[in-house]
């Protein structure tokens, strides 16, 4: 298990997510807002490319391509002097860790990737074995927030007394990479601890808490009815628990709940009383960030105005 004391707050490359940029850009701006107020040393590098995540998991990209793109991104991080890759997306997190391990342990893959770089004149991208460590160079942004939880308490301008908030810890964080989870991978509490620091009342356990969001990448498109039934099962459990706010750490999970909650309500004739945020959006909001200019709530499908009015934000 990963120790919270091992999480760096210096030389972080904030790894941009294509799903964040496309669907919820407020997650990135909220993360930057929070990091700035916590004194985190980070950079965003426009030379970084997509991790291939969804393409990889839907068999559009095979492993060698994903490894080559990861090697390129690792070179970008090292060259700019910010080698601690910090992901906004749990898929980016797992992909980068897997690719790093593959490049370090599989000589054939590493040599093939490097031969392609050299052939095309990109010698500066060549990956040397163990030049990156999947356990000490690749993190999730929620881990950085957790490591700064006491500082977060000091920066709070709005708290959320009595707000029942539930967490959804992404599968690609605590299931796929369970050996690197902070705390118990069978009952992760990272988001809950941060939410509590912001004044919310976390529902630390509810029925179906460890159930996947239902997206499954290709499953949403190939088996949509099954995918949405899984999502509905989770939403039903949250509704029974009286949850007002569901907090996420991955844009893919966020899409599944926020974009498809209205679809499920229409198709199944049900109604849910909860809204959705990424943990960085929630922390930024509690620090006084503008709900639209910083948090980007206008991009959400489930309207947040009722929640924001109830809590006195607007």
Swiss-Prot record:
Binds 1 [4Fe-4S] cluster. Pathway: Cofactor metabolism; coenzyme M-coenzyme B heterodisulfide reduction; coenzyme B and coenzyme M from coenzyme M-coenzyme B heterodisulfide: step 1/1. Disruption phenotype: Triple hdrA1C1B1 deletion decreases methane production from methanol, but does not affect methanogenesis from acetate. Deletion results in up-regulation of CoB-SH and CoM-SH synthesis and transport, and methylsulfide methyltransferases. One of its GO terms (cellular component) is cytoplasm. GO terms for biological process: methanogenesis. Induction: Induced on trimethylamine or methanol, but not on acetate as the sole energy source. Its EC number is 1.8.7.3. Keywords: 4Fe-4S, Cytoplasm, Iron, Iron-sulfur, Metal-binding, Methanogenesis, Oxidoreductase. It catalyses: coenzyme B + coenzyme M + 2 oxidized [2Fe-2S]-[ferredoxin] = coenzyme M-coenzyme B heterodisulfide + 2 reduced [2Fe-2S]-[ferredoxin] + 2 H(+). Its cofactor is [4Fe-4S] cluster. It is found in: Cytoplasm. GO terms for molecular function: 4 iron, 4 sulfur cluster binding; metal ion binding; oxidoreductase activity. It holds the Pfam family CCG. Part of a complex that catalyzes the reversible reduction of CoM-S-S-CoB to the thiol-coenzymes H-S-CoM (coenzyme M) and H-S-CoB (coenzyme B). Probably involved in methylotrophic methanogenesis but not in aceticlastic methanogenesis. The ferredoxin:CoB-CoM heterodisulfide reductase is composed of three subunits; HdrA1, HdrB1 and HdrC1. Belongs to the HdrB family. This is Ferredoxin:CoB-CoM heterodisulfide reductase subunit B. It comes from Methanosarcina acetivorans (strain ATCC 35395 / DSM 2834 / JCM 12185 / C2A).
């Amino acid at each position: 298990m990963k120790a919270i004391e091992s999480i760096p707050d210096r030389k972080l490359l904030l790894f941009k997510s294509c799903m964040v940029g496309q669907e919820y850009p407020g997650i990135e701006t909220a993360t930057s807002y929070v990091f700035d107020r916590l004194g985190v040393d980070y950079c965003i590098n426009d030379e970084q490319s997509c991790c291939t995540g969804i393409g990889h998991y839907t068999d559009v990209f095979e492993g060698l391509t994903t490894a080559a793109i990861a090697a390129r991104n690792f070179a970008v991080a090292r060259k700019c002097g910010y080698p601690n890759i910090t992901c906004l997306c749990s898929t980016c997190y797992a992909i980068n860790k897997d690719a790093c391990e593959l490049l370090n342990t599989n000589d054939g893959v590493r040599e093939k990737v490097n031969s392609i770089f050299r052939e095309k004149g990109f010698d500066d991208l060549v990956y040397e074995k163990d030049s990156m460590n999947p356990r000490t160079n690749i993190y999730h942004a929620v881990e950085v927030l957790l490591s700064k939880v006491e500082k977060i308490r000091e920066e709070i301008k709005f708290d959320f007394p009595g707000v029942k908030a539930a967490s959804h810890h992404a599968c690609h964080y605590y299931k796929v990479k369970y050996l690197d989870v902070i705390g118990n991978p069978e009952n992760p509490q990272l988001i809950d601890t941060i939410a509590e620091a912001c004044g919310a009342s976390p529902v630390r356990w509810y029925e179906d808490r460890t159930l996947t969001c239902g997206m499954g990448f290709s499953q949403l498109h190939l088996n949509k009815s099954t995918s949405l039934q899984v999502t509905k099962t989770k939403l039903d459990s949250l509704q029974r628990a009286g949850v007002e706010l569901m907090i996420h750490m991955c844009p893919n999970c966020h899409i599944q709940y926020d974009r498809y909650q209205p679809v499920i309500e229409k198709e199944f004739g049900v109604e849910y009383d909860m809204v959705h945020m990424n943990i960085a959006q929630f922390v930024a909001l509690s620090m006084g960030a503008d709900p639209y200019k910083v948090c980007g709530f206008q991009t959400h499908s489930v309207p947040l105005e009722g929640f924001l009015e109830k809590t006195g934000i607007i």
